[in-house]
Curated annotation (Swiss-Prot):
Belongs to the universal ribosomal protein uS4 family. Part of the 30S ribosomal subunit. Contacts protein S5. The interaction surface between S4 and S5 is involved in control of translational fidelity. GO terms for molecular function: rRNA binding; structural constituent of ribosome. The lineage of its organism: Bacteria, Pseudomonadati, Pseudomonadota, Gammaproteobacteria, Thiotrichales. This is Small ribosomal subunit protein uS4. HAMAP family: Ribosomal_uS4_B (MF_01306_B).
Length: 206
């Protein structure tokens, strides 16, 4: 399945929540009618079955992190293999993706933009160039912008937005050096309460 490149607002409306696919520190709710389904007249939401709820939650999380179905299923299998809560393990694996860490550090205004920076070899991990968006970052890894890429206007704009919004607690960033440290894998309490990972576990456990 190809990666979706259509209107980001449409995806957020379908899931009924802001998926943070667009740049900016403000929610898109003021621009996008989150409570209406896509379409000219925004059809009302029908009663959803248990399976439908599980499927929608999986699609929501998959779209937030920009992961295709095949890769998402592999993440679930790895999460299930590891000790602890499968749902929490899944979210931690997604949060440890290099493109997501670049986004969390404020070097990109969206995860899609972060994915481009990684793919275009603008990102280094511990001083070595890495161009794989799904690369799993470990606690203590130093993420930096390659020197030749530091003059990109989109990086400067992203850092400015990040300065307004603030960084998450599990990364430490020195914007003057264009680098940051992934201090630790976030706990479940650090992540969005708007995600019901247990619904995803129920879906894949069938």
């Amino acid at each position: 399945m190809a990666r979706y490149i259509g209107p980001k607002c449409k995806l957020s409306r379908r899931e009924g929540t802001d998926l943070f696919l667009k740049s900016g520190v403000r929610s898109i709710e003021s621009k996008c009618k989150i409570d209406q389904l896509p379409g000219q007249h925004g059809a009302g939401r029908k009663r959803v079955t248990e399976y439908g709820l599980q499927l929608r939650e999986k699609q929501k999380v998959r779209r937030i992190y920009g992961v295709l179905e095949k890769k998402f299923r592999l993440y679930y299998k790895e999460a299930d293999r590891r000790k602890g809560s499968t749902g929490v393990n899944l979210l931690q694996l997604l949060e440890s993706r290099l493109d997501n860490v670049v986004y969390r550090m404020g070097f990109a205004s969206t995860r899609a933009e972060a994915r481009q920076l990684v793919s275009h070899k603008s990102i280094q991990v511990n001083g070595q160039s890495v161009n794989i968006p799904s690369y799993e970052v470990s606690a203590g890894d130093v993420i930096s912008i390659r020197e030749k890429s530091r003059n990109q206007s989109r990086i400067a704009a992203a850092l400015e937005l990040s300065a307004q919004a603030g960084n998450v607690g599990w990364v430490e960033v020195d914007s003057s050096k264009f680098e940051g440290v992934f201090k630790t894998v976030p706990d479940r309490s650090d992540l969005s309460a708007d995600i019901s990972e247990n619904l995803i576990v129920e879906l894949y456990s069938k």
